[in-house]
Amino acid sequence: MINDGIRGGYSAAALAYAVANNPLMKTHPYNPAEKKVWLMMFDIVNQYGCCMLGHLPVSNFSFLEDPTVMTEEFISSIPADGDDGYLLEVSLEYPESLHDAHNCFPLAPEHYQTQLEDLSEEQRQTYTKIYGKETYKGSSKLVTTLHDKEKYVVHYRALQLYLQLGLRLKAVHRVIKFHQAPFLRRYIQHLTNLRAQSKNPFEKAIWKLMINSIYGEFYCPFFFSIKPTHRSR
């Protein structure tokens, strides 16, 4: 169940389009009769470090005997800094009323077996040009869709966000409860401060690596690091 919740990194190119109406721009005429529109690009750094500042799973992992006690009201009330955390396997409904608003960046990424009807017209033409009439077999991709989610494994804090943004909880199938604590906070804060005080590219890189490598070790499934050995007598 835990491995089902590990999906990797998601990237996408959205089709959202905006036109700036900025009085400070010299390359595009400003129209004072229209509303001011500013386009901004954000480069958000240290996201791995930010994740590890919070409460993380530590011990006492166990399945709840009755997962139905995890109602939407109860899930929404779980504190981010509480002693207990939860990993849930749920079914979610993606209301059609949210589709237009969420179209460029849907919630709850998942591994999905793509179908021919999922492709754009241009992609279908490209496929036909290359493979002719060969049946499209599809492949598993990490994607965001507006489909309902069945037996979707998710951390309770991510689920709280999904519910807050309008997804509906249909069912709770399994729940793992665990003790959580901010056991990495002081160390991550120390490395972050050292990175901020860096005076050259090498120092910035080494402190960044020491933060990100910890995240990577937590991300790797434990069984990947187990190497069976055989000793003959």
Question: Language-model features: where?
Answer:
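Conserved acidic
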Residues: M1-R233
